[in-house]
């Protein structure tokens, strides 16, 4: 018993001693287990004895110059050096779906799928890929409405091989019957996938261009129509290539290469070379200049009268409203880009984290005030001689009329007072996006190639940033007012039972408040 009492007393004394011992040092110093101390300085105060850091300053000026050389045959060679072992280079051609007015629609789509197939030097696509693999390279071909781009990223040491391969792919494709038949299957599959895709954006983009430009230049279909898949053959492709794949319509662009070496390779493989389709001709040559275009509407109704095994694809209604830009003045391009950034927008649900563009007009005026809106996003489609500023909105089919009225009000407000705070925020976002994208080598390549193809020169990032900073509220009002004087373009997808007529939408855009004309029905 005495032993137990003594043990309990000793335990209590030990606990008291432990409780009395301080867990930490004094407020100014803390103690290591070894007995040493270190100063307890808050993280908001600089450490004593540490030199002040010198941060790098960003002036937006690139360290390497963009050089352009024109060969005797008219082909332009543009390059910009960049630190690193790898390079990105390719051939950009002034061709695309906008030049298919006198041809079967879908040729550019076919050529995109046929790219990097067998050529005069390479028996198959596998042989091309194996050749690129020796230099750690990858290849790709992309076509848009006004540009076709063949690109390769590879080790800079294989520059001569890559330029020779690109020249062979562009100028000497075999276009065998087997390859064309495989391309027909690939195009058919892509069209089926496009029609089953839950995202309506690609279809709406095609529809709004068709509504705005009406079978004219950029209004022509970018994808091959189903009825033309079986009609496009080698003869049709050669006829198109003969007119548009000419040296004066091409740019060989490279990033991460020496300009003199690139020019030397271009002279070796692209100067005085006879293409597979023979001498160039201009039987059906079309210029990029667009003719009389007008606004309009494009609809695709999809109702519930479908098989029970396949519910309607679009259970919401999608409206794509736009107005055509008259970009005949080069100085209008930057204000339109700032206006698009100022409108901003997005979806009602963001999987990428909160806070992106939450102060843009479409977020503040539309998504934050109307909980039933699924999406409200501004898009800017820009081309050499024209453009299109659009707003994509989606909501429940029962809210279609109200949604259209909200969007027409936002279009009218574009030409009204511009707040300086929102303008500065939009300009800062645009410059930030520009500089962030130009950190990527493939993006620099595309920027160099497209600018030289369109203007024979390149505006450097710091020049573009200066133009963006100089945009004033009067510039936004000027370009918006000029845009709204034209006829609107409307594309609609989904259940469109309550969609207002095109005439009512046009009347709303011509009014002061953007309200649709009231309609009265005796029976519902």
Swiss-Prot record:
GO terms for molecular function: endopeptidase activity; metal ion binding; metalloendopeptidase activity. It is found in: Mitochondrion matrix; Mitochondrion inner membrane. InterPro entries: Metalloenz_LuxS/M16, MPP/UQCRC_Complex, Pept_M16_N, Pept_M16_Zn_BS, Peptidase_M16_C. Keywords: Membrane, Mitochondrion, Mitochondrion inner membrane, Transit peptide. The modification N6-succinyllysine is found at residue 63. GO terms for biological process: protein processing; protein processing involved in protein targeting to mitochondrion. Residues 1-32 form a transit peptide. One of its GO terms (cellular component) is mitochondrion. Substrate recognition and binding subunit of the essential mitochondrial processing protease (MPP), which cleaves the mitochondrial sequence off newly imported precursors proteins. Belongs to the peptidase M16 family. Heterodimer of PMPCA (alpha) and PMPCB (beta) subunits, forming the mitochondrial processing protease (MPP) in which PMPCA is involved in substrate recognition and binding and PMPCB is the catalytic subunit. This is Mitochondrial-processing peptidase subunit alpha. It comes from Rattus norvegicus (Rat).
